């Protein structure tokens, strides 16, 4: 399935000047290389992995990060939803709605594949 998602992204980004897609081990990553900044965005978890302005890295992942399907990437800026941290330590207004055994830390959005709905570029 990952190869299929990669192919869909490649087709979506084929006419883009600054955007492309590459595989990092098992995960497709959208790569943005603009004259003013660069960034990497994982499709799994819609997670910002890297951001740099000119040659100054502002955000990055550990060199030991593992790009595995279904495994949350440590670092970057993840989407922590629908809860943050240990599900049991969230307030009752959140934890009362969690009805799964061993819920993942920071919710399930981090390990789900997201889809690119729309894309545009500007200079």
Residue ranges and their predicted role:
Residues 2-123:
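Surface-exposed acidic/polar loop and edge beta-strand patches at domain peripheries
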């Amino acid at each position: 399935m990952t190869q299929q998602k990669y192919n869909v992204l490649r087709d979506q980004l084929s006419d883009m000047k600054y955007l492309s897609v590459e595989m990092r081990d098992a995960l497709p990553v959208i790569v943005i290389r603009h004259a003013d900044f660069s960034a990497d965005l994982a499709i799994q978890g819609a997670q910002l992995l890297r951001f740099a302005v000119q040659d100054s890295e502002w955000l990055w992942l550990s060199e030991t990060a593992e790009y595995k399907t279904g495994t949350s990437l440590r670092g970057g800026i993840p989407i922590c939803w629908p809860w943050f941290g240990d599900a049991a330590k969230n307030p009752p207004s959140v934890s009362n709605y969690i009805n799964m055994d061993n819920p993942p830390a920071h919710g399930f959005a981090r390990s789900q594949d997201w889809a690119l709905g729309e894309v545009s570029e500007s200079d």
